[in-house]
Amino acid sequence: MLNLCKIIKFVGFLALFVAMAGCDLSVKTYDGDNSKVPSNLRAVSYSSLPGWRDDDVRYALQAFRNTCKAKIQYKGSVIPDANLLQEKCNMLPSSTADIATVRAWFESHFQPYQVYNEKGGKTGTYTGYYSPVIDGCKKQTAKCNEPIMGVPINGANYKGIAKKDIVNKKIGRILYWANIVDVQNLQIQGSGMLKLEDGSLVKLNFAAVNDMPFKSIGGQLQERGIKPAGGYSADAVWTHLKQNPKLAKEVIYNNPRYVYFYESPQHSVIGKLGTPLSKIRSVAMDDSLYTLGLPVYISTNLSDGRAFNRLMVAQDTGGAIKGWIRADIFFGSGDEAYKVAHGQHSQGQMFILMPKVYTYVKPR
């Protein structure tokens, strides 16, 4: 009997096995101490997740599998315990498992919690991001007037130094050049593809940030009483700034945040977790609150009004992504991703999937 108890972990018909084996097996969430779950998280059933039965969770499993290729580490976040997430990586179902099997696996291994904000509300803001393709140059030209830099190789400090000073003093290693507006967009998105004059493509991924606050470009235009044709959508703002280069330099340099990049031999988009991002299955979240690698179920709407109910994985972060119910959905690369991502701004609910912990007790 004892050996059977040891090998039983968790399957959909666990209760039947427990009865047969005579085991006393108690189930606990988080790390066995529910008092460590913040009070703004409330346990719910999977039936409470809108559209849960309709989502093809196999794609979310693949995103989680990518997460498992990196070591999930605790870096000061509130929840959950990184070791518990990493343990689930040793229990993944087959990559060929059908939807029902994968759904049952998530239901057996994770407990959903609905997230509430500080005021007790259960909705938050969802935006989108993508990996742009921009024109670039190996040397400075009239068209390519702004450097794209990697972190300083001489160990020079860049933390707490504003963008304007970093660029003017060249605190970093110049990788390539591009239009200043495109470089700002690249920094906001966190990664992108550079198309050089000879047609070759270079992949640039996030390397580091100067830890300065982000100041909205569109917000600055509003403060100045400047309204681009088409309003304050990202597309309208970027177009207006390209038509007004002096203004562009003023407002872009007035945003002190600066992002460094590195050239990647792979064309995959790499998030802060260090693993490739998956289109509409990877999400950027506040890693001061959530351990990267956490499965999260999002219920919101896309910019065209369609319902968006998806199981995703927190694999990235963003300078403006702060708070309990705040996330940035990764929509992929290229023009189509751009159209969806730049129009995305909706309210919705968030459910996080906390790893279950099973405590085994010898049979009496």
Residue ranges and their predicted role:
Residues L2-V11:
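Bacterial N-terminal signal peptides that target proteins for export
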Residues C23-R364:
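Solvent-exposed, well-ordered loop and adjacent helix/strand elements within mature globular domains
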Residues F13-L16:
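Sec-dependent N-terminal signal peptides
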